[in-house]
Amino acid sequence: YNKVKDSGYSCCILKGQGNAVMYPNPLIRIPGDVDVWVNAVRDEIRSLAHSLAENANGHVDDESFNHVGLTVNGITVELHTTPGFMANFVYNRRLQRWLKLNVDEQCSNMVALPNDAGLVAVPTHSFNVVYQLYHLYHHYFYEGVGLRQVVDYYFVVTMLNVECEMLSSLQSELKHLGLWKFAGAMMYVLHKVMGLTEDKMIAPMNAKRGQMLLDDILNGGNFGHYDKHHVLGHNLLRLYRDARLLRYYPAEALSEPIFRVWHFLWRVLNKKFS
C-alpha cells in the first residue's frame, strides 16, 4: 500500500485485509492475496506493477480486464484498474460508472491496522455492502463462494447502520446494478449460517434462491475446489454453472458465454499491443 502511495497514486485495500479490521479479533482472519484498487489508468498501473516487481525481486504474473497481477516477496498482489466487472454489458456499464463515482471516497477512508501496523485506506461500509455483494455474485458465477466470504459479508452488513431512507436508496442501487435478486439469496444464507436478524437485512430473504446458493457454498466452496463437477474442466464447469443459474439470474447467465469470448479477444489484442 505504502509503495503504491509513494509512487504517487491514491489507492485502497479491497476485501481481505480491509475486512479483517471489522472482526472482533482482526488476527483470526487468514487473508489471501492483496487486492489494491489504484486510481489510475491501465498503462500507469502496468508500469507501476513492473516497477514494484523489479524493486522487490518479484515478477509480473498476468493481466486481465480488471487487474494486473504480480508477486512481491512471495506475496500475490493484484493491482486493480477497476475492482470488478459484470458479464452483462448494460449492468457492467452501470457498475463501472458507480465505481468511478466512488473511488475518491474509498481511497481517502483511512483505518488503523492491528498491532500499530500503520494506516491504510479501505472502502467505507456503505460502499462495501454493495461492492462485496457484487463480489460474491461474481464468485458465484465464475469460481464459487466460500464460507470465509460469507462471514466477511456478515460483518459488512452488521456494521452498517441502515436507516429507512438509506435502505430505500441502497435497495434502488442494488436493483440498478442487477444485484437485487442475489441480495435476497444472500440474506437467506446469512440468516441460516450466521443468524442475521431481519431488522439488519438489506433485502427480503428469498428462500428458493438462497437455499440453492447455500447448497453450492457447502458443496463447492471458494473457487469451487470441492465441487464434484470440477472434473469437467474450467470452461465446461462455467457452462454448467451458467445453465443452472439461468432460471434465477438470466441477465448474467445469458451474457457470460458472450462475455467470455469478448474477454478472450480482449486478452489477445491487449497482449499484442501491450
Give short role names for the model-derived ranges.
Residues 1-32, 38-274:
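Conserved NTP-donor binding/palm subdomain of two-metal-ion nucleotidyltransferases/polymerases, i.e.
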